[in-house]
From Swiss-Prot:
Subunit structure: Homodimer.
SUPFAM superfamilies documented for this protein: (Trans)glycosidases (SSF51445)
Gene Ontology CC terms: extracellular region
Active site: E191, E290
PROSITE patterns for this protein: GH26
Protein name per its UniProtKB record: Mannan endo-1,4-beta-mannosidase
Domain of life: Bacteria
The protein's role, per its UniProt record: Involved in the degradation of glucomannan. Catalyzes the endo hydrolysis of beta-1,4-linked mannan, galactomannan and glucomannan.
The enzyme's E.C. designation: 3.2.1.78
Positions of the GH26 domain: 36-347
Signal peptide: 1-24
Species this chain originates from: Bacillus subtilis
Amino acid sequence: MLKKLAVCLSIVLLLLGAASPISAHTVYPVNPNAQQTTKDIMNWLAHLPNRSENRVMSGAFGGYSDVTFSMTEENRLKNATGQSPAIYGCDYGRGWLETADITDTIDYCCNSSLISYWKSGGLPQVSLHLANPAFPSGNYKTAISNSQYKNILDPSTVEGKRLEALLSKIADGLTQLKNQGVTVLFRPLHEMNGEWFWWGLTGYNQKDNERISLYKELYKKIYRYMTETRGLDNLLWVYSPDANRDFKTDFYPGSSYVDITGLDAYFTDPYAISGYDEMLSLKKPFAFAETGPSGNIGSFDYAAFINAIRQKYPQTTYFLTWDEQLSPAANQGAQSLYQNSWTLNKGEIWNGGSLTPIAE
């Protein structure tokens, strides 16, 4: 094993209390009332690209809560690479389920695993394949009209009340993590520039300015509810359009609502991913918030992906690969990805007591 937690902790002991700031510029979360640990992680993450090595956090998707979520993906990666991902993802929203109560599509039983992961040196990402409030449940891929979208945003309608019920249960799950001091990369309403989720576009690369405005209103509504109504001060907000569609920045709700901009990127050639410069133009830390191969599945070489990050996307702060057949463990180059000198793994960012120092 090329990297050992003991080495990292030795550096912590040497530099704690004496580490100078990486620059005079401190990067704060968009929530001014964020808890101190969340502030520390945000500033630390934002300055990762200034390092010469240990600068890109690895990440993996663990599955949908109470359906496919488990620690299997971590175990597969550890067996393949000797390392565990720095970031582990869970999705609270099982938006395809047809249930008697739309809130039954939300589940956060993965929290116990996420809390344990945090305490052992990891960082969780929570995403949402959100059920469609235009219907009693399910239908997360059912297109809706702009009129239906407006009804969802209106708290006096049946649709609006369904949305509020969904948000309340999601917030309950995030509150459990807050109460344990867990900072969360929170990624709602992803891939909005695609035509496959109800909150996004309805046609392939067909721009709809009204739709874009409605999306922004929905995103801000979720932000205000989580931050102001529920007091969730442990969230870092991730905005991640699809790399293979246009209008990546058009849906951007504004710099006051987003901490990290990323891409959901599935590709055959990691050197030809679209949207990197567009995301950088938003002046936020950048990540591949969801990623994996779209071709050569089972034989894709993840060594090429980390090399592409180094050569073409050097401002990347983290990547999160999908699971099952798209996982590095099911393809080639997993060890090259996790053992690369640029890659940060579990235990190398957070030890349950203090962040590793930022050393130039």
